[in-house]
UniProtKB/Swiss-Prot annotation:
Membrane topology of this protein: Multi-pass membrane protein
Protein family: Belongs to the MntP (TC 9.B.29) family.
The entry's keywords: Cell inner membrane, Cell membrane, Ion transport, Manganese, Membrane, Transmembrane, Transmembrane helix, Transport
Classification lineage: Bacteria, Pseudomonadati, Pseudomonadota, Gammaproteobacteria, Oceanospirillales
Entry GO MF terms: manganese ion transmembrane transporter activity
Full protein name: Putative manganese efflux pump MntP
GO cellular component: plasma membrane
Function: Probably functions as a manganese efflux pump.
TM helices/strands, residue ranges: 3-23, 39-59, 67-87, 109-129, 137-157, 172-192
InterPro entries: Mntp/YtaF, Put_MntP
Compartment annotation: Cell inner membrane
Length: 196
């Protein structure tokens, strides 16, 4: 995976968390920079760990699926991307995000971590997919974590001003990026077969 694809992947993986942080920021009466940085850091750490877990699972399964790994990567990324687009269009949030938004004064680190975990399940699935590609998983996880920390901090700070509309479109964009990366993975493999 080239650096541009890695950056796109990192920001695509941060869109769920960005949407959740906009909702969180919109619900808070006053958002302080330190609170936004703390929320961003928690989301970033969780989002960085999940692809590592998925990569470990995918690496174990690699010996069983090595002949069709590119197709699996394409299908998984396309399904994840499609789900993100559908969720953005339908404006449906997971229960953890709704719970966080209904308790705006509760800034418990555990509630933030639970919300971060709920929005990072797709990062674990992407980690499984990354095990099927030629990528430095540490670099990918760090990039995903940093992008998420940045996007969540900004989303929390801007939440009151921009509301939930941007969160919806961010999720749709993230889904389109994941589908595009899936197509690129499949194309690279098929182009490699054609030139062999």
């Amino acid at each position: 995976m080239n650096p541009a694809s890695l950056i796109l992947l990192a920001f695509a993986m941060s869109t769920d968390a960005f949407a959740a942080s906009i909702g969180r920021g919109a619900e808070l009466r006053k958002v302080r920079l330190l609170s936004a940085l703390r929320i961003g850091a928690v989301f970033g750490v969780v989002e960085a760990i999940m692809p590592l877990l998925g990569w470990a699972l995918g690496h174990v399964a690699m010996r069983f699926v090595s002949g069709v790994d590119h197709w699996i990567a394409f299908v998984m990324l396309a399904l994840l991307g499609g789900h993100m687009i559908w969720a953005g269009v339908k404006k449906e949030d997971c229960a953890a995000i709704k719970a966080a938004e209904t308790q705006p004064e509760n800034r418990s680190i555990w509630l933030i971590a639970f919300t971060a975990l709920a929005t990072s399940i797709d990062a674990m699935a992407v980690g499984i997919t990354l095990a099927l590609t030629d990528i430095n998983i540490i670099a990918a996880s760090v990039a995903i974590g940093l992008a998420t920390a940045l996007m969540v901090t900004l989303g929390t700070l801007l939440g009151r001003a921009i509301g939930t509309i941007v969160g919806k479109w961010a999720e749709i964009l993230g889904g389109l990026i994941l589908i595009g990366i899936g197509i690129a993975v499949l194309y690279e493999h098929l182009a490699g077969l054609a030139s062999a």
